[in-house]
Amino acid sequence: DLIKKGLSFSTPTGTAYEYSNLGYAMLGYIIKRVTGKPYEQYINETIIRPLGMTSTYWEFSKIPKRQLAHGYRWINNNWQEEALLSHGAYGAMGGLITSLEDFIKYMNLHMNAWPPRHDTEATVAKRSSLREMHKPWNFSTLNAQYKYPGGRPCAVASAYGYGLRWTSDCEGRTTVGHSGGLPGFGSNWTFLPEYGIGVICFANVTYAPTSIINTKVLDTILAISKIKPRQLIPSRILLQRQQELMEILPGWNTKGKNIFAENFFLDYSINALRSEANELFTKAGQIKQVKEIVPTNNLRGAFIIEGEHSNIEVRFTLTPEQVPLIQEYRIREIPK
C-alpha cells in the first residue's frame, strides 16, 4: 500500500547516494515475488543454514530466554528497557537476531573472498560475487579532516557497495562493513580485506556507537601488532621472466631469448637499454643478491638487485597473451 500510494524522493533517482531502509524492505518483498518464499525462509535456506548459524532468528519470541539480550536506552540518568520489536516486512533491513559466535561465520564468508584465487568455491556464494559487494560502487564523501579515535589525522574516502560500506584512508587501508541500529541495540562489523582481520561489536544500547568502537579497535590492533597487508604470491611466469631478464642484464645479449613482445624493440632502443644497464651495474659494483620479484599483479612486478655500492630496481610488465612476453621495462638506481 505504501508503494502504491507513491513515494517521495530526496533527489532524482540515480543521481546521489542515500541510505534507505525502505529500499531494503522492498528487496525483501522482491525476494518473495521472485522465489515464491518469504525472504526470511529463502535467506535461512541459502545462507543461514549452510553457514551453520544455529543461533540466528528473525522473531525474538522464538529465542530461548537465557539467550535473549534485552535492549536499553539511557534517559534522565537512568537505564530504561526498550520494547522488543516483532518481526515484519521491515525485518529485511534489520530484523536478524544473532550471536557473535554465529555472526563470525557470516563475516568469515566475506573475509574468505580475499585474496582473489582459484580455490574451491564456498557453497553459499562465489568469492567473486562477494567481492562485487565489497567494491565502492557509489562514492559518498571525502573527509580530508578525519581523525582516528586516537587523534591521528588521516583523510578518508567513503563509498557504498552492495549493502556494505567501504572506506579507504590516507594510509591505503581499505575497510568493508556495515552498521545497524534499532531502539535498544547497535551493531557494527568491519573487516580489512588486505589484512585478513575483522571485528564485530554488538551492544544492547540504543544506537550504540559501535562503528567508532570497532574503528578504534582495528586501528589499535594494527598499531600494536604491526600486521602488514597480504603480499601477492609471484606467478610462475613472473618468476621465469625475472630469471630470463637477469640472464641478459646488463649486456642485453638477446640472441635466442624469445621473451619480448613483438613491438618491444619498437618502443626501446637496444643500444640505449644496454648503455643504461651497464652504467647502473657499474655504479652498483659487485652484485650481492637478486631479491624475488614483488608482484603488482600476475603480469606485473618489480625486483631489487643488491649491489656493493648501490641497488638497482627493475620493473616489467607482461603481455596478456597465452604465453606472456615482456611488454614494458624500467630500470633505475636505488641509492643505499
In which residue ranges do the predicted regions lie?
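Hydrophobic pocket/interface hotspot
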Residues: 103-106, 255-257, 316
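Short, small/polar residue-rich loop motifs at catalytic or cofactor-binding pockets
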Residues: 183-186, 310-312
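A short acidic/small-residue loop/turn micro-motif
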Residues: 114, 183, 206-208, 332-335
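Short, surface-exposed loop or secondary-structure junction motifs
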Residues: 1-181
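Short solvent-exposed beta->alpha transition segments
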Residues: 254-296
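Short, well-ordered beta-strand elements
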Residues: 177, 188-191, 195-204, 313-315, ...
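Short, gly/Ser/Thr-rich active-site loops of penicillin-recognizing serine hydrolases
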Residues: 142-146, 201-272, 336
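Exposed beta-sheet edge and beta->alpha loop/turn motif
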Residues: 292-336
